[in-house]
């Protein structure tokens, strides 16, 4: 009997270990997958742990046309709301072109797909974009801030870029200061606008109606409440203000009789 009980216990433990093993493997795989993808997302969706990738592109052309190329990759953890960015270094040709665009007062543009994880423009549902004067980016030594605005569905609805410090003052910038971007990223979640106090108003109205139903006496008019006091007062005033017609008639008759005796 004891041997059978021990065998059943061992079998139960083996079953529990078999059930727990896949869940541990899934958890470790989620963490490992996130670390392995990292900066290599290239706009692809990180399937595990609620992390998605966004491709960051930029454009700066002499003729001010839009010709977007990859600048880096954004990694958005939708569970904790964190945003990270990995960027590549500008080539010598790109640094020279950026200087030329800045000298011509041209624009530096950035864009991000609206739908995280999209592979192309059609799947992305379009792009959101922003721009700054190229000269301000050059004089800031490629120091800028990107802010992503997202909605409740997890789509990107806007992006803004600002340089630190901003403005174009004509300062000389060495070529070594235009190799690496110094970028801070910020995620702007949706804000809930205050709605009308419809529920509170309805609740207050129902409470008032319930209170009136409990005290129907309060719904009566002033006359309905105090008629038993008002009617006697009105009758008293009517009786006290009426002329004494009987007394006046008796006096007139006596005077007439005296005159006829003479």
Swiss-Prot record:
This is ER membrane protein complex subunit 10. It is linked to Neurodevelopmental disorder with dysmorphic facies and variable seizures: An autosomal recessive disorder characterized by global developmental delay apparent in early childhood, mildly impaired intellectual development, speech delay, behavioral abnormalities, and non-specific dysmorphic facial features. Some patients may have seizures, brain imaging abnormalities, mild skeletal defects, and renal abnormalities. Keywords: Angiogenesis, Endoplasmic reticulum, Glycoprotein, Intellectual disability, Membrane, Secreted, Signal, Transmembrane, Transmembrane helix. CDD domains: EMC10 (cd22209). It comes from Homo sapiens (Human). One of its GO terms (cellular component) is EMC complex. Part of the endoplasmic reticulum membrane protein complex (EMC) that enables the energy-independent insertion into endoplasmic reticulum membranes of newly synthesized membrane proteins. Preferentially accommodates proteins with transmembrane domains that are weakly hydrophobic or contain destabilizing features such as charged and aromatic residues. Involved in the cotranslational insertion of multi-pass membrane proteins in which stop-transfer membrane-anchor sequences become ER membrane spanning helices. Present in serum (at protein level). Increased expression seen in the left ventrice after myocardial infarction (at protein level). Expressed in the pituitary gland. Expressed in brain. Glycans are attached at residue 182. Residues 1-25 form the signal peptide. Residues 243-262 are cytoplasmic. The chain crosses the membrane at residues 222-242. GO terms for biological process: angiogenesis; positive regulation of angiogenesis; positive regulation of endothelial cell migration; positive regulation of endothelial cell proliferation; protein insertion into ER membrane by stop-transfer membrane-anchor sequence; tail-anchored membrane protein insertion into ER membrane. Glycosylated. Belongs to the EMC10 family. Component of the ER membrane protein complex (EMC). Pfam families: ECM10 (PF21203). Residues 26-221 are lumenal.
